[in-house]
Amino acid sequence: MLLTLKNTGQLLVAACSKVARSLAKYHPRVNHHRHCVWCSKRGLTTGGTAQKQDILFHLCQQRHFLSGETLTCTSLVQGCHNLGPLGVELKRNLVAQWWNSVVVYREQVLGIDTLHHLSTPSSAPEKPLLAICTQHLKELPRDQLVKWLEDPAGKLEFLRHELLYGALLEYVPSMELLNKKMPFGLAEIGKCFHSIPEERNKGTILPRIGERTVASLVWFSSPKSSGQWQDYWLRQRLQWWQKFAQSPSGFSCNDIQDGQGRKSSLIQYEFPWGRETIETLCNMDDSALFQMHPGCTTKLQARDGRKSVVPHVVWVSGDLDRGILAYLSDALQQTEAPAVRGQYHQREVLKLHPTLAPIKVAVDMGKGPTGELRLVCQGLSSELREQGVYVWPGYQETLHGSLEQLYTKYDKMGVLFTVLVSESTLENGLLQVRSRDTTLKETIHVSKVKDFLVRYIAAAGNL
């Protein structure tokens, strides 16, 4: 049989199906978790929620938080979109907050970083994504290709669907580092991949691939305390998600049970189009470790006081890309803008939490000698950047509108403060600082602006 690009794709589909059948017995707990995360029912409501959804998608594209040919709730949830510059900064801030909360501020959690591809299918999804070189397949003789198709699982690597596998693999060396003392956790943030449901791939040979950034904590504790730890981490994680929200009630928790009666907890957010799972917590007892390390009971034992036992696993897995969507949806508010020619209208404000807002300060200049004002703006921006403050250089823009148009644009970008340098700044050192949340304008001396803004941002992080 002559291999072409088309029939090579068909052969890959056949191989994937064969691998899927051979892996059906593996990791039912992981498959149950996956079903909880990706198969939620969505029904778009009409009226205000539908309007908010349209406004949200338009704003995210207009202000470059998200990008893609067409943004829909399905494409966003399935991970088929890109992040624009502001989305990247928002994500970077969210990742930093997660890492600080789970790793930096705790004594018993270690960070790890594992490979994107798996060498064993023990935690592969029901329809695994295989890492295959099609050129190599096309060069294989027919007899070798047939032999490969008969048993592909042992000769391939799989793109990871979850981060659990890497943590279980790193359990033994990490336990040795901690002198085999429990409890402890392994945390990781990384990309994971999944196939798009078949109804989205009609007319195509190979399935589309979606991706998401997953934040995972795998917690190892004694069997007798694993249930308490699961409850503890559920409280911690729900409080963490609610901490940065304008409306904390948008995040909620629901408990479910798998076929074996084991409890899992879902942290969900109420989007305009329906409820979606943001994070999942489940107690996997000791079966996950035994599946990863068969026949190694002694090697898996850790110290629980004077006893040595195989720990139970509590797994926390969060989708940070959905978290970004949740906070964008939560932050979007409509306020009444000042009247223009006697007409009032609504304008959008993105009230992101100060620690998550991608741009903290925008520096602009008003009327006056352009060259001198630009030098003041550049100096102030440099001072703020040295303090780790992300500054938007509005003074470099060549197209200038009214101040209200400027404030409207920055409100949609979620900018916390707008600093306006004007001719009076050159005369007496005073400039104007406008707050996104209150719309109040305060006059501050240029020498005190940096300390004022840095203190505010630092204080917001401690709320």
From Swiss-Prot:
Pfam families: HGTP_anticodon. It is found in: Mitochondrion. SUPFAM superfamilies: Class II aaRS ABD-related (SSF52954), Class II aaRS and biotin synthetases (SSF55681). Gene3D superfamilies: Anticodon-binding domain, Bira Bifunctional Protein, Domain 2. This is DNA polymerase subunit gamma-2, mitochondrial. Residues 1-44 form a transit peptide. Disulfide bonds: none annotated. InterPro entries: aa-tRNA-synth_II/BPL/LPL, Anticodon-bd, Anticodon-bd_dom_sf, Gly-tRNA_synthase/POLG2, GlyRS-like_core, POLG2_C. It comes from Xenopus laevis (African clawed frog). Heterotrimer composed of a catalytic subunit and a homodimer of accessory subunits. GO terms for molecular function: DNA binding. The lineage of its organism: Eukaryota, Metazoa, Chordata, Craniata, Vertebrata. GO terms for biological process: mitochondrial DNA replication. Keywords: DNA replication, DNA-binding, Mitochondrion, Transit peptide. Mitochondrial polymerase processivity subunit. It regulates the polymerase and exonuclease activities promoting processive DNA synthesis. Binds to ss-DNA. GO terms for cellular component: cytoplasm; gamma DNA polymerase complex; mitochondrial matrix; mitochondrion. Its main location: mitochondrion.
